[in-house]
């Protein structure tokens, strides 16, 4: 009972839904509204349908048949010998892999997530751009990295940095939906002030993000200017 469908499937992607959106969807299936709350709670803990023991088997089978529930699968795990840092390779439903990093500090835990499979930005110092951009990640695939890392380490995640594979502002809609999902009080409840969005400098995306009214930290990579020739290099910020 996996609930996974081929990438691009028309089946609703339930991990990309807010709790209220999930409530509406579950009610549309003829099920009780409170079942959505139970399901949402399980998904935020990274549980598979077989682990959702307080939900009827018939309900789980129905959702697995009708919906797309995408979880990140740990394909590889690399643990630091110096501290509690763990680097993950997560396999997505279509076989693409993305990287995430779990970091633990005195003040809490942070996960660095990817926003795309591959990258189109062409920064020569970054290996992520070698094969170009394969595709954007869905909100659920970005959120799933945070959930999977927390589940694997048995830790609450306190912060997020969007500094993995891909350019978050080149996948704007998924990035913004992810930010709303990961900061939701009904979900992982990670404060927006504990989230950093890294960009190589997509100005229209920066302006749009500022207009969203979400107090995330914006990190601009100045390394992307290294290979710009001197005559065309912008003035220092």
Where are the predicted features?
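Flexible, acidic/Gly-rich N-terminal and inter-domain linker regions that tether
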Residues: 1-109
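Conserved Radical SAM active-site core
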Residues: 96-216
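Short amphipathic alpha-helical interaction patches enriched in hydrophobic/aromatic residues
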Residues: 26, 43-47, 127-130, 164, ...
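Short amphipathic alpha-helical segments with coiled-coil-like heptad repeat character
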Residues: 47-51, 205, 236
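Single conserved hydrophobic/aromatic residue that forms the stacking wall/gate
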Residues: 226-237
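Short, acidic/turn-prone active-site loops that include or flank metal/cofactor-
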Residues: 117, 223-224
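Phosphate-coordinating loops and pocket residues in cytosolic domains that bind phosphorylated ligands
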Residues: 54, 211, 230
């Amino acid at each position: 009972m996996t609930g996974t469908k081929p990438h691009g499937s028309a089946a609703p992607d339930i991990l990309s839904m807010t709790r209220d959106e999930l409530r509406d969807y579950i009610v549309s299936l003829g099920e009780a509204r409170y079942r959505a709350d139970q399901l949402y709670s399980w998904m935020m803990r990274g549980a598979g349908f077989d682990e959702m023991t307080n939900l009827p088997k018939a309900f789980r089978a129905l959702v697995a048949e009708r919906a797309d529930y995408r979880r990140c699968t740990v394909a590889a795990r690399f643990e630091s010998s110096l501290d509690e840092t763990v680097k993950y390779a997560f396999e997505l439903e279509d076989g693409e892999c993305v990287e995430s990093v779990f970091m633990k500090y005195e003040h809490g835990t942070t996960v660095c997530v990817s926003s795309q499979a591959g990258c189109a930005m062409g920064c020569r110092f970054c290996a992520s751009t070698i094969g170009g951009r394969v595709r954007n990640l869905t909100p659920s695939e970005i959120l799933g990295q945070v959930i999977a890392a927390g589940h694997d380490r048995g830790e609450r995640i306190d912060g997020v940095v969007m500094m993995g594979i891909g350019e978050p502002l080149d996948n704007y809609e998924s990035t913004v939906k992810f930010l709303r999902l990961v900061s939701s009080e009904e979900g992982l409840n990670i404060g927006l002030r504990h989230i950093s969005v890294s960009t190589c400098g997509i100005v229209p995306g920066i302006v749009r993000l500022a207009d969203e009214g979400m107090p995330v930290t914006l990190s601009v990579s100045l390394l992307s200017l290294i290979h710009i020739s001197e005559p065309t290099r912008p003035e220092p910020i």
